[in-house]
Amino acid sequence: MTRTAYVNGVYAPLRAAAVSIQDRGYQFGDAVYEVWAIRGGRLFDREAHFARLSRSLRELRIAEPMSGPALMAVIAETIRRNRVSDGIVYLQVSRGIAPRDHAFPSTLVRPCIVVTAKSLDRAILNERLATGVNIISLPETRWARRDIKSINLLANVLARQEAKEAGAFEAWFVDDDGFVTEGTSSNAWIVDASGRIRTRGLSNDILHGVTRAALLRIAHERQMQVIESPFTIAEALAAREAFISSAGNPAVAVIAIDDTPVCDGRPGPVTRALGAAYLGGAP
């Protein structure tokens, strides 16, 4: 089946879809993005992702490309045209097309929007949930506004490639004080030696993960002990469990860090319970 993309008001075959070479997203990374998981034909955490998109746009002073209902209609149509039941939707909004200049355009420009959707093999996620993943740790090298979901991801790309070359699935960044911030495309968690679920608190240091928020809500509803505080790699290795979360990988166990097993090297009960509750929940 030929995949279809939405670009600035037009649905086109993915291979033919294009943006201007003067698009500020292309030239400066002056753009934001969002990713929704689709499971069983449903968008998970739909409204929370829309809210984060709006926040990122406000932080960069980029205008909303269209109304919320209109944007939802575009997303739904993109999913329909690509016949996606299990997969992801990717949406990107740039400041628009303008002559190259680092400062914002002096005249009003229209934001550029791209929406794509693709199917993913659910069996791959199920296997990952069942077996867990290995990760590595690396020094934090990203900019200071990680709370904005910007397309500026070069440091993430380099770290993820280093993880891949090390035979790992993900990399956790570690700040100058020795605390884990997050992964290249996921939030970081542990269940510490006292049985408390821990994840770094919200600030400009990390992306305000939508799946992170959903898992915190589930944990509180189940009266699990939760604390939002940073932790070190040493604490993660001494923990009962460690895991990552993202739209595509909700509550996936980390079974080894830098080739050292976490606990017994298997997904733990808290991670499994949170993942099952999240995947069984409503969007």
Where are these regions (language model features)?
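Glycine- and Gly-Pro-enriched alpha-helical subdomains that act as flexible
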Residues: 172, 179-202, 208
